[in-house]
Regions:
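Catalytic active-site module of serine/aspartate enzymes centered on a nucleophile-bearing elbow/loop
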Residues: 358-394
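Short beta-strand/loop motif that positions the catalytic acidic residue
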Residues: 318, 324-326
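Short, surface-exposed "cap/lid" segments of acyl-processing enzymes
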Residues: 109-153
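Alpha/beta-hydrolase fold nucleophile elbow
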Residues: 193-207
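Alpha/beta-hydrolase-fold enzymes
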Residues: 214-299
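Alpha/beta-hydrolase active-site loop
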Residues: 170-195
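Glycine-rich "HGGG/HGxG" loop immediately N-terminal to the catalytic nucleophile
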Residues: 156-171, 370-371
Length: 394
């Protein structure tokens, strides 16, 4: 962090957030501690201009539950042509200005704050939001990172949480999410968030957020100095089982107040049991963290689901260190056993990152399901992630 920003932070931790913001600054900033209490954070909205290729999807958002369910029945049929048919409409352009919710957290300890040189860009998974990274006291990756001398920027993806919710089919697609993440990485690189300048930027993703982060290293290999990917593998064989467990519904039919304003096409899980089935392994998770995640459940769209595979390709030009972290019993991407028939972390590393540096690592979180952050082994996973960065001089 540059010295002038550090001095301003000591006088008023959020002075630099509320003065001299350009068009890329955080608007209406709100300051406060992290959920775990170990970080000092500012959150607010940032407007990003997006212009990226998309796909003209031949699909309209289903208006009732029978139509939602039938879409997934047809998508996962053994000889399905659903995805091919829907994505046959040709290219489109996704363009516009969108408000994205961000949360920048820094160490509360002034001595640690003075040493901050690296920021981690945290990208959550599908049906989650930025709170995944700071889910509960004792299960906050944000706080672990702060204690180790790192800044973090978490955010709500386009169409999620406090960010804008444009057309869930034609706009909220995977390429748009990549464009948002790329833009945020650029702002961090160029000291355009509150004037804070960081020497290094690390991309950290979970689940679909790992897919987006991996997509960044393929399309924009200079965005990140290192990446940490959790809840991911080279196989999507168990995704249909996950979708069945979710029993996705139009979010505006869910009683949760955060969904009442949404149009059809934004989908969420029907029940807490479905979330547990897909994301958790009993009795190895913290029940308070589980309840918090259920309370903060978010949305996904078929716009993303139908286009996510299009951004997946080996990151042949990314030469930085890569860390792949999975729960031992991840259902979504490992079918419940990430060590069967071989270590799926090592497979993913070799396929997606053939040019990664020798400092790359993998880690299996003992007894954890997909949502590693909320499991009892979560703190050990966080410790490993920080050690990986330190081992690589970041």
């Amino acid at each position: 962090m540059n010295s002038s920003a550090f001095l301003a932070f000591l006088v008023n931790p959020f002075a630099s957030f509320t003065s001299a913001f350009g068009s890329n600054g955080i608007s209406n900033p709100v300051s406060g501690p992290s959920t775990g209490g170990g970080s000092t954070c500012v959150s607010g909205d940032i407007t990003l201009s997006i212009n990226t290729p998309g796909i003209k999807l031949g699909y309209e958002a289903p208006q009732d539950q029978m139509a939602v369910t039938e879409s997934f029945v047809e998508l996962f049929q053994v000889d399905s042509t659903f995805a091919a048919d829907v994505t046959a409409g040709g290219p489109s352009v996704i363009s516009g200005d969108y408000s994205i919710f961000v949360k920048l957290c820094l160490p509360s300890d002034p001595e640690i704050l003075a040493q901050v040189k690296t920021v981690q860009l945290l990208t959550h998974g599908a049906t989650l939001d930025h709170t995944y990274w700071d889910i509960a006291p004792g299960y906050s990756y944000v706080d672990v990172a702060s204690a180790a001398g790192y800044a973090t920027l978490s955010y709500d993806q386009l169409g999620v949480g406090n960010s804008d919710h444009p057309d869930p089919i034609q706009v909220v697609q995977a390429t748009a999410q990549v464009a948002v993440t790329h833009a945020l990485a650029g702002l961090l690189r160029n000291a355009e968030l509150g004037g804070y300048r960081f020497d290094k930027v690390v991309g950290v993703g979970h689940s679909a957020g790992s897919t987006l982060t991996q997509g960044i290293t393929t399309q924009y290999p200079q965005d990140f100095d290192a990446v940490i990917l959790s809840g991911t593998s080279a196989s999507a064989a168990s995704v249909p089982l996950t979708m069945a467990a979710f029993n996705l519904i139009n979010a505006n039919t869910d009683p949760a107040p955060q969904f009442q304003h949404l149009p059809a096409g934004f989908l969420t899980q029907q029940s807490a049991a479905g979330i547990q089935f897909a994301f958790y392994r009993q009795p190895n998770f913290d029940e308070d963290a589980f309840r918090r995640q259920v309370a903060h459940k978010q949305t996904n769209t078929l716009g993303v689901l139908l286009t996510l595979g299009g951004i997946v390709a080996p990151s042949t030009e990314f030469t930085g260190p890569v860390d792949i972290v999975n729960g031992e019993n991840d259902l979504v991407f490992c079918g419940g056993n990430c060590l069967y028939p071989t270590d799926q972390n090592s497979v993913a590393l070799s396929i997606f990152y053939p040019a990664a540096s020798k400092g790359s690592q993998t880690y299996i979180a003992a007894g954890a399901g997909h949502s590693i952050a909320a499991h009892k082994s979560g703190p050990d996973s966080f410790k490993h992630m920080i050690q990986f960065l330190q081992d690589n001089g970041l």
